[in-house]
Amino acid sequence: MAVVPLLLFGGLWGAVGASDLTVVTCGSVVKLLNTRHNVRLHSHDVRYGSGSGQQSVTGVTSVDDSNSYWRIRGKTATVCERGTPVKCGQPIRLTHVNTGRNLHSHHFTSPLSGNQEVSAFGEEGEGDYLDDWTVLCNGPYWVRDGEVRFKHSSTDVLLSVTGEQYGRPISGQKEVHGMAQPSQNNYWKTMEGIFMKPSELLKTEVHHAEL
């Protein structure tokens, strides 16, 4: 099997089979790019001054900011084993690596656009059912090169960016919020990160599909 290099954190390189790079798996740590506005999903220990007062979630243009890494996990109160391929239509959690809080939404109004607030919530990776997002994509699995949407499992809004920009103390960062309407503003794709190789489960399913 051909082997290709994969760029990981801080210039660390690994080698995995080319066919293993296509699906996104649980346990992977990734950056997510909003393809319409070219910003990466980001969080930090800065709280909203309005709404819920929880940790803010933004979009940043910087490629190398470590506060833009998110771990892909199973939905609340479940475990998705490392290397398990994420299916289209599957609910997941996205846990912010540096703060341990989960991507979250609720019926608060976002500060700039007046859409639905998106925050980071919980402690050490554990929050509540409002941390669950359903992966919307074409085909059986979420694939690395494919654009996906994230639909909040409880309120049905889509994770979105429409270009509103914050001032101090987070000058230049874009608001991330939830919107009911599907549009180009709510497409995302994986970029940099550590991608866990798919487990044997996927290989078994592919074999059966070919029989």
Features from the language model and the residues they span:
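Lectin-like carbohydrate-binding module/patch detector with strong preference for beta-trefoil
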Residues: 2-211
